[in-house]
Amino acid sequence: MSSDFTKEVDKDNIAIITWNCLDKSMNTMTEDGLRSFQQLLTEALSDEKIKGIIITSGKVDFSGGMDLSTLEALKRNSGSDPASKIFDYIMEAHGLLRKIELGRIDDTSKSKPVAFAGSGICAGIGTEIGLACHRRFLSSSKNS
């Protein structure tokens, strides 16, 4: 599992999920990264002690979007039906965004507020993550 995302819980029981691709100059979403993010978000949403969630970046810029090499690998490894494999991946990302929007895992769980704290460039899936959150806090930089 990717370590592009980490989760910590502060003294007020707020979960902070940080996106920080250590081996890249900018955060880009990979297949492992998406699954790691999904797992950490699910853990935070299902933990009754956690009151809310903040999604942020460990870098100056929030995100450069989807890692294009991930899409290429999905296409290359999907056999005779690459569109289906890529569609499944995009729908997995959509499910994650929907979970953020709802602030809960399913219709039976209690909703939690999810906030976005970003700065700098925020492209593609990064923009979608920010828009899925209930509140957005951006730096005053002209690049945000």
Positions of predicted regions on the chain:
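Flexible loop residues that form catalytic
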Residues: 22, 58-60, 141
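Catalytic-core regions built around general acid/base machinery
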Residues: 40-43, 89-110
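Residues that form or flank phosphate/diphosphate-binding pockets in enzymes
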Residues: 28, 63, 125
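Short coil/turn segments at beta-strand junctions that form active-site/ligand-binding loops
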Residues: 48-51, 87, 112
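Glycine-rich beta-to-alpha active-site loop
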Residues: 99-144
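Conserved CoA-thioester-binding segment of acyl-CoA-metabolizing enzymes
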Residues: 1-56
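Glycine- (often His-adjacent) and acidic-residue-rich active-site loop
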Residues: 57-96, 122
